[in-house]
Amino acid sequence: MGDRERNKKRLLELLQAAGTGNAHCADCGAADPDWASYKLGIFICLNCSGVHRNFPDISKVKSVRLDFWDDSTVEFMTHNGNLRVKAKYEARVPAFYYVPQASDCMVLKEQWIRAKYEREEFMTDGKTISPSGNREGFLWKRGRDNAQFLRRRFVLLAREGLLTYYTKEEGKGPKAVINIKDLNATFQTEKIGNPHGLQITYRREGHIRNLFVYHESGKEIVDWFNALRAARLQYLTAAFPELPESELVPLITRNYLKQGFMEKTGPKQREPFKKRWFALDAQERRLLYYKNPLDAFEQGQVFLGSQEQGYEVKEDLPKGIRGNRWKAGLTIVTPERSSIHREWPQQQVTHWPWEPLVGRRSSQLTLGHPAGVPRSWQPLLAVNAAFTCRLPGPYHGPALGGWGSGVCPQGLRHLQ
């Protein structure tokens, strides 16, 4: 066996070696990484390898299977490995700092990689990152009633638990004052149409208000995102001192469990089907729908309660609708009424994770699609699996960013 094949075999064995962490990308956790930084001594996925190529003074990459590896380089990889290198470069990652996963957008991955290896922010002797009390700067914000993005000044007052923004630099007062306890932030790059697009949501007069913002700098928008997360963690820590930090971190911000177009009819099931953009919020157990993906407010929402409370998801369309061009669909039944939905387009049918979700008050919704709807659409199971406890006794109403009393997200336990 030649050196090339022998060293390739050694590398493939290293990928599966127990106690090394090499079986997953050192940066995003993707399984079965096929690339490696032979200057850092880590195994990474194809997507993250593209980021590493941008700073060759710090990291140099090779394909594990396709490139030639000499003996000394393989020895270096053997001596290091993912867990050992992560212990060095991730020694002091703040609890609020978002660590991206394989499914996250590229700007989060890129800034995480640069923060670790280029700026060395999380090393033991690195610069201390603390949750700043205040942050101020300009972001491009989409107008509420049009598609134009305008430059707006945002001010975060973390200690006061407020985020404000101004339409004029020298305005008399803020256009909006947002309470951190009601705020969520999630990157929505494809929906916004910008690689740095961030969606900020908060409660306003019983509705969910959406702000769509971006910044030209990837570092700046990710810094804003983590500043909001730091403020959220400060709020959660003060509001729920009995809970350990490890249980609060998953509640800081959240991504939608699923988003996409479907068509729905009304509670009488005689109304025409209308195409709507749906967003499934597992943490608040709500299915929101919009006329357009970038609307400032939802058109309506359905709370997904438990089956014991009278909520149900039926994997079919009512008889009066079945037999038209829509061959299958979903009906969401609530104690008050029912609604019918049909999914759009065909390729999304298998991806709506309905099973974990069903909770408080809503209506019946019906969805359909000619290709049929498999079991993976059942919302009740997905939500019920995650929400099996109640809010702490002293708190009522929309605590922790909006859970009603009697319902709480995964991780919170009954404290009474």
Give each language-model segment a name.
Residues 1-17, 46-129:
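Cys/His-rich, Zn2+-coordinating zinc-finger modules
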Residues 2-6, 27, 66-70, 86-96, ...:
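Surface-exposed beta-strand-to-loop junctions
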Residues 3, 115-131, 140-147, 169, ...:
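Polybasic, Ser/Thr-rich intrinsically disordered tails and inter-domain linkers
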Residues 25-28, 45:
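Short cysteine-rich clusters marking metal-coordination/redox-active sites
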Residues 30-40:
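Canonical RING-type zinc finger of E3 ubiquitin-protein ligases
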Residues 132-134, 233-284, 295, 303, ...:
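Disordered regulatory linkers adjacent to lipid/PI-binding modules
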Residues 146-152, 186-235, 270-274, 312-365, ...:
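Canonical pleckstrin homology
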